[in-house]
Amino acid sequence: MRPILLQGHERSITQIKYNREGDLLFTVAKDPIVNVWYSVNGERLGTYMGHTGAVWCVDADWDTKHVLTGSADNSCRLWDCETGKQLALLKTNSAVRTCGFDFGGNIIMFSTDKQMGYQCFVSFFDLRDPSQIDNNEPYMKIPCNDSKITSAVWGPLGECIIAGHESGELNQYSAKSGEVLVNVKEHSRQINDIQLSREMTMFVTASKDNTAKLFDSTTLEHQKTFRTEPPRELAALSPNYEHVVVGGGQEAMDVTTTSTRIGKFEARFFHLAFEEEFGRVKGHFGPINSVAFHPDGKSYSSGGEDGYVRIHYFDPQYFEFEFEAREAGSPSG
């Protein structure tokens, strides 16, 4: 499995995301650049210029007309995907950590960090109402007093958002009233990543407590746990198979004194039902900061602390592989 190497950032990758069809791959990093690439061959299609700080999050709407980005320059920006023109600039009091379009692409949400005396907020804007954008007045703003949001996605049908917190809590906020619909605490440390399944019926979380976990999207009921040795800080679900890819590795501050083997910088593949690891992919020099499956399930991409994005197309053996679970008490060897 020889990867396509994308080099378009000078700093560590913070998030990568495919559009719905999977022909485009958006990448953001701890530099002010937002890149878009053709996923089939790794050609850079263009760059969205305007941010002045690290960009933490990116999302594209359902029909890939608009792109949304959130940055440490205390702003969330809306872009025309095709031309790269900035359509809206929403200023905030602190860094924007997460952002996303709802199912219809009409409503955007973003969360801000708890820093410099400002508390964490989740803001909702309706793009069909220009006055909200012009006046920087969201139709709803939810305060998060206890623990800041570190990852968030829209839930099924855009009725709620699912947010992971620094404390390890998972919340479901209503997109209409802002009330907390469900609250669970299955992780003991910060939740760094939340990614939905293709049907949006379940989602996977990855935390600094060395686990990735599978949840029901509606009830937030905990289903499965994938345990690993170093902190696994991100995870993604395959759209075609019962597979989970998880990535991460040793903290970036320790990387210079660590070999890639000891630092556990590879992506690991787990079976969704059996919770067992069945494969690893190496390549990055340093921790993996973001992973995403292509919507067709034939490839996946990873972005690392080394500033590179790698597009991995699976070998034929991957599609022929059948996982056989051992019965309890049967010999292992």
Curated annotation (Swiss-Prot):
Q: Name one GO biological process term.
A: formation of cytoplasmic translation initiation complex
Q: Does the keyword Protein biosynthesis apply?
A: yes
Q: Which UniProt keywords apply?
A: Acetylation, Cytoplasm, Initiation factor, Isopeptide bond, Phosphoprotein, Protein biosynthesis, Repeat, Ubl conjugation, WD repeat
Q: Where are the WD repeats?
A: 8-47, 50-91, 144-183, 186-225, 283-324
Phosphotyrosine: which positions carry it?
A: 308
Q: How does it assemble?
A: Component of the eukaryotic translation initiation factor 3 (eIF-3) complex, which is composed of 13 subunits: EIF3A, EIF3B, EIF3C, EIF3D, EIF3E, EIF3F, EIF3G, EIF3H, EIF3I, EIF3J, EIF3K, EIF3L and EIF3M. The eIF-3 complex appears to include 3 stable modules: module A is composed of EIF3A, EIF3B, EIF3G and EIF3I; module B is composed of EIF3F, EIF3H, and EIF3M; and module C is composed of EIF3C, EIF3D, EIF3E, EIF3K and EIF3L. EIF3C of module C binds EIF3B of module A and EIF3H of module B, thereby linking the three modules. EIF3J is a labile subunit that binds to the eIF-3 complex via EIF3B.
HAMAP family the record matches: eIF3i (MF_03008)
UniProt protein name: Eukaryotic translation initiation factor 3 subunit I
Organism encoding this protein: Oryctolagus cuniculus (Rabbit)
